[in-house]
Amino acid sequence: MTIVVGLDQHRAQITAEWVDTATGEIGRSRVRPADRAGLRRFLGRFRGQQLEVALEATTGWRFVVQELRTIGADVHLAEPAETAARRGRKKRPKTDRADARHLRELLLVDRLPESWIPPDHILDLRARVRLRHTLVDQRGEWQQRIHAVLYHHGCPHHHGIGLLTAKGRAWLDGLGLPSTALEQVTVALGMIDVLDVQLAPIDKQLRAYARRQPGCRALMAHYGIGHLTAVTILAELGDARRFSSSREAVRYAGLDITVKQSDKRRAPGHLSRQGPPALRWALYEAAQSGRRHSSPDRDYYLQAAERLGGNRACLAVARKLLKRSYHTLRELGDQALQPA
């Protein structure tokens, strides 16, 4: 006897609907509060029974999967966008109960679009990589604010001067900015210094991890991929065997070009940007090495740059690097994701 369950998870509550495949009996319940203790109480009724559970890969899924596996449940993590698409275009009521039922029905007829559930050490690595990516983004935003303030007050361009170096900061002090502008620049520099303090130990840990981990070492054999880009690619791409081809890995990363065509009309394509932003960042950073004289991709980059421009040429090299990374990790098999 198998019980098939659909869970719709939110911060305030988890809505559940299940069906006993032997009797056809349907049950419903809500878990409040939607925390670990509340979920354990709810799952107590299913202990000792064969359980298949579907839930979407939304915020909070990790602890739910852990608790479900504790009682021996077979867990299926649904990809949210594909799951919503399988509702069809016909308008239907959108409630938590309807969402739970939709997941349960898709799982029951084997049509659930599943996401990969990474092992715990990859989830932890992914969390650290994404934290670093967030801090780097914030650091860049504060730098952009400094540039905006300088331009707003008509300051000369800082040709060849790094604004965050000692020379650059001395140059900023000598501009004679108005008090409000000086305050903006001072606060921005202070925030950048704070972010640098937070980034330093994270970078150190990730670099050390990349030196020890087999998958990262294999990725770093490719020209342009360093310690931080390798560990980001590994964390975000995960088990490359889950993709049927390198093209599917490109789609997952959001580096594929969308196409809108009707009859003879074809709109210009753009990046789908559907995948993890940190993965696209790592690949784009690595791809910028393609313009170097020693790069094996230099000729390809120059040809693409002549037709498409430098930015799109870098994206083309990024796709090539992703395909190489996919094949490298796939060939390593289980060794690619070994804990460091």
Where are these regions (language model features)?
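A detector of single, family-specific signature residues
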Residues: 1-340
